[in-house]
Amino acid sequence: MIQPQTLLNVADNSGARKLMCIRVIGAAGNQRYARIGDVIVAVIKDALPQMPLERSEVIRAVIVRTCKEFKCEDGIIIRYDDNAAVIIDQKGNPKGTRVFGAIAEELRELNFTKIVSLAPEVL
């Protein structure tokens, strides 16, 4: 569960390394916590030099991994080692061209198919 002030890793090659959540937009209405597949507004806390994204830039991101476990529809419980997000634009397309690490299959159902197609492993 991601809430404001939570630090997240970036799971793509857009140039940012660490994000801090400042607002949970979510999939439906006013939510306090973000789960896998929810959209957040975040600020970049750490970035690589000579990349298009800079430190202290406000961006949108979609949550792809959380430490808090969640139950799939088939009853399997999935838990990841870190909190991670993929940076997206206003239309929901990823800014990076690669996605690192495994992501959940629930993103496919939430119409983030471009992120799912870039991922090396879908659980």
Swiss-Prot record:
Annotated compartments: Plastid, Chloroplast
SMART domains to which the protein is assigned, alphabetical: Ribosomal_L14
TM region(s), chain numbering: none
Alphabetical keyword list: Chloroplast, Plastid, Ribonucleoprotein, Ribosomal protein, RNA-binding, rRNA-binding
Keyword Ligase: no
Pfam families linked: Ribosomal_L14 (PF00238)
Family annotation (PROSITE patterns): RIBOSOMAL_L14
Entry GO terms, CC: chloroplast; cytosolic large ribosomal subunit
Any GO BP: translation
GO MF assignments: large ribosomal subunit rRNA binding; structural constituent of ribosome
Family recorded in the similarity comment: Belongs to the universal ribosomal protein uL14 family.
Function as written in the Swiss-Prot or TrEMBL entry: Binds to 23S rRNA.
Quaternary context: Part of the 50S ribosomal subunit.
NCBIfam families per the UniProt record, alphabetical: rplN_bact (TIGR01067)
Protein name: Large ribosomal subunit protein uL14c
Gene encoding the protein: rpl14
